[in-house]
Amino acid sequence: MNDATRTSTTPPALPMPDLRDSFPGPFPASAHADDIERHATQWLRTFPLIRSERALSALTHITGQGVARTFPTAGRDELFLCADLFLWLTAFDDAHGEATGAADPARLLRTTSEYVHLLAGHHEPPGGPSVFGAALRDLLDRYGERATPAQYARLTAHLRDNLFGILWEAHHLHRPDRVTLPDYLAMRPHTVFVRTVVATAEVMLGYELTEPDRSSEPVRELETAVADLAGWINDLASYAKETARDGSATLGLPALLMRQHECDLEEAFRRASLMCEQQAAVAAARIAELTAGGGPLADHAHALRSVASSYVWHIDDSRYRT
């Protein structure tokens, strides 16, 4: 077993993926981790998206440490922007998605209309901005100052995907039997926000892919493998916490594998761990292929390696402990 990928929330009897061959640690981290955490705390004072001081402290800590590992070579201001984007998504999901959204999906749908309005380029939503709307406007303004029009369009498209993913998850949370395993695997990258993080990489690190490179098979396969890996290891790491909080974790990879294969929890974890290891190997192979040639493709491969490594690292953080 790989200690880097094991979390204390998972009972020792349950298998966890061994990712040492594909993503060996230790993982490099930016020297700005503490600065990111301090900035994140201040940003959440300016835009009070989280009411609980304990939750705020936990989220700013994992964000500071996680973003420092996601883009370890990025500049300080770029790291702040990436952290704030992750804070917004996570705080919105905690406040309006999951169990809250499942209790009233129609209200969640009405809430998201303000953000769709802003993402479409309208500066003032009808009725004025909420605190989440004001925070999103701040993020979009700052990102727009750094990004090309194409990069900005990609980010806003992924943010819309995230909003849809949160709504999708809330809609199905109390009726997971309606969700097939292929449906879940297709949606999970959007609910774990990893494709949005990947979409920021070019701006964070100062490179730009051509459209032919972006649509090439090696890049698409690498991004898919990293997106899958992020969601799946998150599901394994958070399983015990979700079970302790809600009594079950029925809309997640282990539960869906148990239903699909009519197996017990240990076998589901074993199957999920193998899935993680296989996708990690795919990602590592594509990273090696793309870094060999240099240029923006190599920059992108290095960025994806750091993104994947950050998910491998952060699943052991206290945010996932019961």
UniProtKB/Swiss-Prot annotation:
Cofactor: binding comment: Binds 3 Mg(2+) ions per subunit.
Entry keyword annotation includes Metal-binding: yes
EC number(s) on file: 4.2.3.193
Key words, A-Z: Lyase, Magnesium, Metal-binding
Keyword match Metal-binding: yes
Cofactor: Mg(2+)
Residue ranges of the region described as Disordered: 1-26
Binding site for Mg(2+) 2: E98
Biased composition (Polar residues): 1-11
Motif DDXXXE motif, chain ranges: 93-98
Binding site for Mg(2+) 1: D93, E98
SUPFAM superfamilies reported in the protein's UniProt record: Terpenoid synthases
Pfam families per UniProt: Terpene_syn_C_2
UniProt cross-references to InterPro entries, sorted A to Z: Isoprenoid_synthase_dom_sf, Terpene_cyclase-like_2
Reaction equation(s) it catalyzes: (+)-copalyl diphosphate = (12E)-labda-8(17),12,14-triene + diphosphate
GO MF annotations in UniProt: metal ion binding; terpene synthase activity
UniProt: substrate binding residues: R188, K241, R319, Y320
Protein family per UniProt: Belongs to the terpene synthase family.
Record comment regarding domains: The Asp-Asp-Xaa-Xaa-Xaa-Glu (DDXXXE) and Asn-Xaa-Xaa-Xaa-Ser-Xaa-Xaa-Xaa-Glu (NSE) motifs are important for the catalytic activity, presumably through binding to Mg(2+).
Name this protein carries in UniProt: (12E)-labda-8(17),12,14-triene synthase
Gene: rmnD
